[in-house]
């Protein structure tokens, strides 16, 4: 491995971890409501709990900022890896792995972060639009029917990973980005362990895209 490769991988790891650790849900809950989202509802500092705890007025800013944060990282390192190594997808996948770690264990907030579904969702689109499209479509259908955010995100992202492996089998898509994204999805699912228990017991709270339910949600 050349020195430029080492620098590139190190930069992707460090920058993605630090930038992804900046959590819009925590920042906005403190700035607007003078509360830490981690003390509200389920305690998860993410879009779902923010919307349940404070309503939808600012929740969509959390959603868009989380996506924008990932998009900037994945675009930057996709372009850098393509320029120096000719590997767009590898750059995106490496960035995604450390973005997941930064989102889940942020150094800025005592290593208490979120579950990372928006990191996975954004990465899926940058890895291959077909993976992003399938994952987003499945998530949307499940949200509009069963209204279980945790189930929708896990199923959607698992299918996105499946699409990447299918592309690996049928096209020149690399095995490494497919494997790294699959690790991200597995990590995200493990972060949903409490939700999985509630799903099995039939006690998982519903999530409504529209409307402002403010109960103590489960995500």
Language model segments and positions:
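Interfacial segments of multi-pass membrane proteins
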Residues: 51-56, 77-80, 98, 116-146, ...
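Short, non-helical or kinked segments that cap or interrupt transmembrane helices
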Residues: 36-46, 107-121, 148-156
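Helix-coil boundary and interhelical linker segments in multi-pass alpha-helical membrane proteins
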Residues: 1-11, 74-94, 125-131, 166-180
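Cytosolic, membrane-interface loops and tails of multi-pass inner-membrane proteins
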Residues: 26-59, 113, 197-219
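N-terminal signal-anchor transmembrane alpha helix
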Residues: 7-32
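Loop-to-transmembrane alpha-helix initiation sites
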Residues: 133-135, 149-157, 172-182
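Multi-pass membrane catalytic core of lipid/isoprenoid biosynthesis enzymes
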Residues: 52-78, 95
């Amino acid at each position: 491995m050349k020195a430029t490769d080492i620098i590139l991988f190190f930069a992707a790891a460090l920058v993605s971890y630090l930038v992804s650790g900046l959590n819009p849900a925590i920042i906005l809950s403190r700035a607007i409501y003078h509360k830490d989202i981690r003390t509200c509802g389920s305690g998860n500092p993410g879009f779902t709990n923010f919307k349940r705890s404070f309503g939808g007025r600012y929740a969509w800013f959390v959603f868009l900022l989380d996506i924008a944060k990932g998009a900037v990282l994945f675009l930057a390192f996709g372009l850098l890896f393509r320029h120096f190594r000719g590997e767009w997808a590898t750059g995106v996948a490496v960035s995604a792995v450390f973005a997941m770690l930064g989102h889940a264990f942020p150094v800025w907030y005592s290593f208490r972060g979120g579950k990372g579904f928006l990191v996975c969702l954004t990465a899926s689109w940058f890895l291959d639009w077909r993976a992003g499209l399938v994952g987003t479509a499945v998530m949307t259908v499940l949200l509009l029917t069963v209204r279980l955010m945790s189930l929708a995100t896990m199923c959607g992202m698992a299918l996105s990973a499946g699409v990447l492996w299918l592309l690996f089998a049928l096209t020149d898509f690399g095995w490494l980005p497919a494997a790294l994204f699959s690790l991200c999805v597995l990590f995200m699912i493990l972060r949903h362990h409490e939700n999985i228990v509630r799903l099995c017991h039939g006690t998982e709270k519903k999530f409504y895209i529209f409307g402002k339910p403010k109960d103590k949600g489960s995500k």
